[in-house]
Amino acid sequence: MLRSSNDVTQQGSRPKTKLGGSSMGIIRTCRLGPDQVKSMRAALDLFGREFGDVATYSQHQPDSDYLGNLLRSKTFIALAAFDQEAVVGALAAYVLPRFEQPRSEIYIYDLAVSGEHRRQGIATALINLLKHEANALGAYVIYVQADYGDDPAVALYTKLGIREEVMHFDIDPSTAT
């Protein structure tokens, strides 16, 4: 069982939290910066493996300049959990500036933890780190979509937030007339 430790260190201006468990090494979480493209690639590979979609996440990855610029962007957040140097959890989120008021919200786009590291608090630690990032950015809410049938994700998000019933539609831009 992982627990948040009181040992929070700084990596540049990006928070890095260390977590520890009795049967494993230290797990640390941090926001990835533009100098951590290799770790971003590992996060993409993790998403591909855990979502069963290697073709999307691993076979057509952007070049290093693109990923570096994305990690430098003020509207993209990539968080990772490391066991030693291996990425064992990752979260990708977008900062969405609002138009009706000068504030932003954050959308969790992807969140995954490797199979052998699940049920150890890593996803919760990544979301907690995202809360700190959101506070620093002045965001007023973090939201995430969970699919019916993904019971572990629904349970995690129920524990951490308030459920809203919404409808989601994918609109194909190639059908423009």
Swiss-Prot record:
First-level EC class: transferase
Pfam families: Acetyltransf_1
GO process terms (BP): response to antibiotic
Keywords, alphabetical: Acyltransferase, Antibiotic resistance, Plasmid, Transferase, Transposable element
EC number(s) reported in the record: 2.3.1.60
Residue stretches of biased makeup (Polar residues): 1-14
Gene Ontology molecular function, alphabetical: aminoglycoside 3-N-acetyltransferase activity
Disordered: region residues: 1-22
Sequence ranges assigned to domain N-acetyltransferase in this UniProt record: 25-177
Catalysed reaction equations from the record: gentamicin C + acetyl-CoA = N(3)-acetylgentamycin C + CoA + H(+)
Domain of life: Bacteria
Keyword Acyltransferase assigned: yes
Function of the protein: Responsible for gentamicin resistance and has a limited substrate range.
NCBIfam families reported for this sequence: AAC_3_I
Name listed for the protein in its UniProt record: Gentamicin 3-N-acetyltransferase
Protein encoded by which gene: aacC1
